[in-house]
Amino acid sequence: MSFFFSRQSDISFLLFSESTSTTRNSSQARLLSRLAVDGSKGRAMPVLNTTRATAAASGVDATLTIRDGPVFHGTAFGANSNISGEAVFTTSLVGYPESMTDPSYRGQILVFTQPLIGNYGVPSNQRDEYGLLKYFESPHIQCAGVVVADVAEKYSHWTAVESLSEWCAREGVPVISGVDTRAIVTHLREQGSSLARISIGDEYDADEDEGFIDPGAINLVKRVSTKAPFVVSNPNATFHVALIDCGVKENILRSLVSRGASVTVFPYNYPIHKVADNFDGVFISNGPGDPTHCQETVYNLGRLMETSSVPIMGICLGHQLLALAVGAQTIKLKYGNRAHNIPALDLTTGQCHITSQNHGYAVDASTLPSEFKEYFVNLNDGSNEGMMHKTRPIFSTQFHPEAKGGPMDSSYLFDKYLENVQMYKDNSKVYRDNRPSQLMIDILSKERVGVEPSPLAANAI
C-alpha cells in the first residue's frame, strides 16, 4: 500500500492507493518529509501558553449578564478577561476537567450546578501508552467561561498539580463564583439556553447587544477539528478505522485503540468516501454547535453510504450528522441535556442505561427514513438518543458511551461496532491488510494539527 498526499487550501488531504511497490521517488519523499514537519504541532498541552495566559483575577468583582434576563454579581477568579457565549448548565457532580476540555462545549459559558467546584484540583497533562491525554478530553479548556456557586481555593488529590484558578488563568478562561447558580439554572430551564457575558470589573451594559456573541451562528467544528490527518496507533492492531474529527474526545480515541484498532483521524470536511475502502470502518466523532453548519460532512457521509458498505458508528454530533446525511432533520432543544446520569432506553432490548450526555441539538426521530429505526430514547424528555440501519452495520448514539466522566453502562457499543468491523473484514471478497504501514505511522503526525485554543475576550469562540 502506498500513500499520496495533496494539499487543498490549508488542509493536507491523505489519499490512499493500493500498490505492492515499496519504492518511492525522491520528490514524494521530500513532500512526506515536509508534511511530517507540518504535522508535528497542535496536540501537546503546553507548559505555559503565553498567548492565552493572563494574570489571575482573584477577588475582583465580576458580573454574569444574561441577555434579556437577570444580572448576577459575584467574584472573579481565573483569567482577567471578558467573554461572551451561550450559557448552558451541567448537573454533573464530578469530572470538571473532562467537561471543560470537551470540544463539544466550545463557545459556551458552562454553569456547574454542583455547589463546590475545584476541590480536587487539576491533574497533569500525563499521557497513556497510546499518547493520549489521561485526564483531559483535549489539550485546552474549550468552554468560553465558567460559572460556579463556590470555588475551592485549596485542593487535594494525588493527581493534582495546580488549582482550578491557576489552570483557568493559564488557559485564558474567566470564571465567576459566589453567584446563585440555582437561580441561573432555573432561568435557563424556563427560558431556554441564553446568550450571556462574563465581565470582570465594571458591570457590562446589557443593552449593548453587539457584546453578545452567538456561537450558534458560527461553524465551531471548523475551530476544533484537526487541520490534517494524524494517526493514533496500536502496535498490535487488528483493525484500521477512519475517524472524522468534529471535535473528538481523547477517550473516544482510547476506546477504539484499546480494543485493538489503529485510528487515522481526518478533518471534519475530508471526502471520506474517496478512501473508505482502504479502512475496516468509519467513525464520526462528537463536536460542538449546530450540525447544519457542517454541510460538507453531511454530503460526504451521504456519498459514503451510497458507495461503500463499510461499518459506520457516530456519537453525539456524529449521530446528528449521520441523520442529516440520510435525510432526517435535527432540532434545537430548549436547554439541552448535559449530565452524567440521564436514562436512555434501548428499544431493541428494553434495557435502560444511565448515560453521559452533552448536547443542545437532537435528531427528530419522526423524520428518520424507513430503512432506519430508533435505537435509544431519552426517558426524561422523550428525545431521540440513537438510530440504527435495519439491514446494514450502521448505528449511532446521541449520548457518550465512552463517558469521561460518567457511567460506563453503554461502553459495550464500541465492542458492537468493532464486531461489525470484524464481520465486514471477514466478509471482504479479497483480503486486504489495512493495518497502517510503518511509513504511514512515521509520516503522519500523532498530533491534532492546527487546532487553535479557545480565544480570549471578544473572540471567545
Curated annotation (Swiss-Prot):
Q: Any idea which UniProt keywords this protein has?
A: Amino-acid biosynthesis, Arginine biosynthesis, ATP-binding, Cytoplasm, Glutamine amidotransferase, Ligase, Nucleotide-binding
Q: Which reaction does it catalyse?
A: hydrogencarbonate + L-glutamine + 2 ATP + H2O = carbamoyl phosphate + L-glutamate + 2 ADP + phosphate + 2 H(+)
Q: One GO cellular component term, please give it.
A: carbamoyl-phosphate synthase complex
Could you state a single Gene Ontology molecular function term? carbamoyl-phosphate synthase (glutamine-hydrolyzing) activity
Entry annotated with the keyword Zinc-finger: no
Keyword Ligase tagged? yes
Named in its record, the pathway it takes part in is:
Amino-acid biosynthesis; L-arginine biosynthesis; carbamoyl phosphate from bicarbonate: step 1/1
| EC number, UniProt record | 6.3.5.5
Enumerate the spans annotated as Glutamine amidotransferase type-1 domain: 240-427
> Can you say where in the cell this protein is located?
Cytoplasm
Report the active site residues: C316 (nucleophile), H400, E402
**Signal peptide, first to last residue:** none
GO:BP terms for this protein? 'de novo' pyrimidine nucleobase biosynthetic process; glutamine metabolic process; L-arginine biosynthetic process; pyrimidine nucleotide biosynthetic process
Mention any Pfam family matching this sequence. CPSase_sm_chain
Give the matching SMART domains: CPSase_sm_chain
InterPro entries recorded = CarbamoylP_synth_ssu, CarbamoylP_synth_ssu_N, CarbP_synth_ssu_N_sf, Class_I_gatase-like, CPSase_GATase1, GATASE
User: Its domain of life?
Assistant: Eukaryota
HAMAP family, per database record: CPSase_S_chain
Q: What's this protein's family per the entry?
A: Belongs to the CarA family.
Its assembly, as annotated, is: Heterodimer composed of 2 chains; the small (or glutamine) chain promotes the hydrolysis of glutamine to ammonia, which is used by the large (or ammonia) chain to synthesize carbamoyl phosphate.
User: What the protein does?
Assistant: Small subunit of the arginine-specific carbamoyl phosphate synthase (CPSase). CPSase catalyzes the formation of carbamoyl phosphate from the ammonia moiety of glutamine, carbonate, and phosphate donated by ATP, constituting the first step of 2 biosynthetic pathways, one leading to arginine and/or urea and the other to pyrimidine nucleotides. The small subunit (glutamine amidotransferase) binds and cleaves glutamine to supply the large subunit with the substrate ammonia.
| This protein's name | Carbamoyl phosphate synthase arginine-specific small chain
> Per the UniProt entry, what species is this protein from, by scientific name?
Chaetomium globosum (strain ATCC 6205 / CBS 148.51 / DSM 1962 / NBRC 6347 / NRRL 1970) (Soil fungus)
